[in-house]
Amino acid sequence: MDMLHLSARPDARTVVTYHSDIVKQKRLMKLYQPLQERFLASVDCIVASSPNYVASSQTLKKYQDKTVVIPFGLEQHDVQHDPQRVAHWRETVGDNFFLFVGAFRYYKGLHILLDAAERSRLPVVIVGGGPLEAEVRREAQQRGLSNVVFTGMLNDEDKYILFQLCRGVVFPSHLRSEAFGITLLEGARFARPLISCEIGTGTSFINQDKVSGCVIPPNDSQALVEAMNELWNNEETSNRYGENSRRRFEEMFTADHMIDAYVNLYTTLLESKS
């Protein structure tokens, strides 16, 4: 896209959404960086999903005068679920557990979650699949983690039922490759307390420490255990965090908020062109 844009030189306002720095492919970044800088310098506006990412990104620091923040948003969820499906999941996993939803990738911190599950013995349900699935399942089996349940990939209805049944959402991503954290938004939509790591990205924009949940140091399984115990042993605190996460979702992270922000941005750019 960037090469096409630079070669075409369109006579139109240009907006690019910047989701993530190049984190893992550092050698590739050295080759790509000159092209990236030319491309970002040429556009009229860069959209980032959180002020946290703008502040921590070495790339975006060069373009703060043209960068705006528009968070990702989700639709409100007021659907009544099939009682039989709810009963199935309540029988399968109960209605008081910590929920992880996501791809099994190197930056998701699943090894940290398994370590915390072993130390705390608290119930954990893991939803998803991906490149590391076999490895993660094997590790859980070798550790004898009978308190950890793997569901595999689920459709939206089953996933949303688990959000409603869980005690809290755990999101132990420990690397900046996790640029935002849609799972945290989904948890907030269902008024769940959240646990995430401070990695300088949108995860700490969605989840505020001691407001909507717990923000812990990355790659620290003991800190994760302590956060899980806080939510498990203090129902009043857990409920307050959940109410706050839902309120924050309604105030900042709905699809309507996102759409309105983009409409306002496009309108402003078009008016400035004319």
Language model: regions and residue ranges:
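Acidic donor-binding loop of glycosyltransferase active sites
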Residues: 98, 164-179, 192
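Donor nucleotide-sugar binding/catalytic pocket of nucleotide-sugar-dependent glycosyltransferases
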Residues: 36-82, 93-95, 150-151
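Nucleotide-activated donor-binding/catalytic signature segment of Leloir-type glycosyltransferases, i.e.
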Residues: 122, 137-157
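An aromatic- and histidine-rich active-site surface loop
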Residues: 1-11
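Short hydrophobic beta-strand element within catalytic cores of glycosyltransferases
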Residues: 170, 189, 193-197, 207
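A conserved mid-protein helix/loop that constitutes part of the nucleotide-sugar donor-binding site
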Residues: 96-119, 131-137, 222
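A short, well-ordered alpha-helix in the C-terminal region of glycosyltransferases
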Residues: 223, 230, 237-252, 258-264, ...
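Conserved acidic donor-binding segment of nucleotide-sugar-dependent glycosyltransferases
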Residues: 208-221, 228-236
